[in-house]
Amino acid sequence: MDDRLTIFIISDSLGVTARTIAKACIQQFPNHDNWQFERYSNINNKELLDKVLEKAKDKNVCLMFSLVDDDLARYAQERSEEEHFVYVDLLSNVIKAMSKLSGVEPLGQPGLLRKLDKHYFKRVEAIEFAVKYDDGKDPRGILKADLILLGISRTSKTPLSMYLADKHLKVVNIPIVPEVPLPKELNEVSPKKIVGLTNSVERLSQVRKERLRSLGVSGTASYANKDRIYEEAAYAEEVMRKLKCPIINVSDKAIEETATIILEMIKENQL
């Protein structure tokens, strides 16, 4: 028999949860480096289970079952008793307790935690969209977006884009810089799809100085200069006025608070 200590992870899904539990448990033992794992995924019938148990016969093994099918879990326990294996059924007792408490029979379907539904894909698509079109990288995204955020530097455009992407919205954010022409595509979308973001000059100066320091640059650079920020803010206000888009001052607002305001706007405009 192989003297090494082995944990067999046996699951009718991927077995990720069971492996995480097992790894957490072995940390309690000083010799945990001597343990090894073997994971057997998608073990969803007795024939497959028997093949795994056959492999366990010649090893110093602990079996960890993560089986939601009640019949298969019961069979695994019976076979383990017959072969005198050390084993743990991770799910059966928990599922039975929940069923007893709720009065509802469990579905017995493996992999439900990891099933990818349309909402998941929509969220991922929105996040990828936000990354692709962040900071005006590609103005073509404006015509594809659910929402366009405009603002000068450090007005929370990127974190807002990502937060709203988590709500399944495809968001483009465009920086406003006096010396840089705005994308012509902005004139081709409804003002209701555009939101302008502003901030107080004092707050912008403070945030920009902190940003420069984090980059190892002097806080006296023009980027953080109040006169420069006044110039940018005035230009941005003029742009937003011409576009006739709503404007939100993000000063002293959490990302979640600003996002809630935007979501309410979208709801009102039925976009």
Curated annotation (Swiss-Prot):
Cystine crosslinks: none
Query: Which key words are in the record?
Result: Kinase, Nucleotide-binding, Serine/threonine-protein kinase, Transferase
TM region(s), chain numbering: none
- Identify a single GO molecular function assigned to this protein: ADP binding
- Which reactions is this enzyme annotated as catalysing? N(tele)-phospho-L-histidyl/L-threonyl-[pyruvate, phosphate dikinase] + ADP = N(tele)-phospho-L-histidyl/O-phospho-L-threonyl-[pyruvate, phosphate dikinase] + AMP + H(+); N(tele)-phospho-L-histidyl/O-phospho-L-threonyl-[pyruvate, phosphate dikinase] + phosphate + H(+) = N(tele)-phospho-L-histidyl/L-threonyl-[pyruvate, phosphate dikinase] + diphosphate
Listed binding positions for ADP are G151, I152, S153, R154, T155, S156, K157, T158
The reply on keyword 4Fe-4S is: no
Q: Enumerate the Pfam families for this protein.
A: Kinase-PPPase
- Stated EC number for the protein is 2.7.11.32, 2.7.4.27
Q: Which domain of life is it from?
A: Bacteria
Biological function: Bifunctional serine/threonine kinase and phosphorylase involved in the regulation of the pyruvate, phosphate dikinase (PPDK) by catalyzing its phosphorylation/dephosphorylation.
PANTHER family for this protein: PYRUVATE, PHOSPHATE DIKINASE REGULATORY PROTEIN 1, CHLOROPLASTIC
Provide the family line.
Belongs to the pyruvate, phosphate/water dikinase regulatory protein family. PDRP subfamily.
Report what the protein is called. Putative pyruvate, phosphate dikinase regulatory protein
Organism this protein belongs to = Streptococcus uberis (strain ATCC BAA-854 / 0140J)
Recite the lineage of the species: Bacteria, Bacillati, Bacillota, Bacilli, Lactobacillales
